Amino acid sequence: MTSLLLFGAGGLFDFDATLPLMALQVVLLTFILNALFFRPVGRVVEEREVYVTTSRAEAKQKLAEAEKLELELKEQLKSARIAAQQLIQEAEKDSEQLYREALAIANADANAAREKARREIDAQRDSALTQLKGDAEKLGDLIVNRLLAAK
């Protein structure tokens, strides 16, 4: 019974002209689908794959450039900070040097003024002593003259 269903008229393996016609339709449909659907879709998929690959490569390149620029900028910032610190240190040294020079000049001026005042005081003292000696001699002579005149 099963053999009749499989090989009989209208069965599963009926070898009349329908089978080759169906095979021809399948081949024809495959060529049509390949020409109208699979090739364009394959092309679009390949184009997108190329686009994605290119975009990823460009993104990696840009990322590498950005990292390189970041490193360069960090180095520039580091060197700028070092230069600024050096400038600050030099300015502090210059300021300290100017302070010391100004202090030395002020001390020298103060010492010179003190020495000048001491010399003036000494000169005035010597002058006063000389005048007092002269006055004392005159007064002594006057006293001696009066004592001699009173005798």
From Swiss-Prot:
Membrane topology of this protein = Single-pass membrane protein
Where are the membrane-spanning stretches?
18-38
Its localization reads: Cellular thylakoid membrane
| Sample GO molecular function, one term | proton-transporting ATP synthase activity, rotational mechanism
SUPFAM superfamilies according to UniProt: F1F0 ATP synthase subunit B, membrane domain
Keyword Transmembrane helix included in the entry's annotation: yes
**Which InterPro entries does the record match to this protein?**
ATP_synth_b, ATP_synth_B-like_membr_sf, ATP_synth_b/b'su_bac/chlpt, ATP_synthase_B_chain
Might you report a single GO cellular component term? proton-transporting ATP synthase complex
Q: Which family does it belong to?
A: Belongs to the ATPase B chain family.
Which NCBIfam families does the protein's record reference?
A: PRK07353.1
Subunit structure, interactors included: F-type ATPases have 2 components, F(1) - the catalytic core - and F(0) - the membrane proton channel. F(1) has five subunits: alpha(3), beta(3), gamma(1), delta(1), epsilon(1). F(0) has four main subunits: a(1), b(1), b'(1) and c(10-14). The alpha and beta chains form an alternating ring which encloses part of the gamma chain. F(1) is attached to F(0) by a central stalk formed by the gamma and epsilon chains, while a peripheral stalk is formed by the delta, b and b' chains.
The name under which this protein is listed is: ATP synthase subunit b'
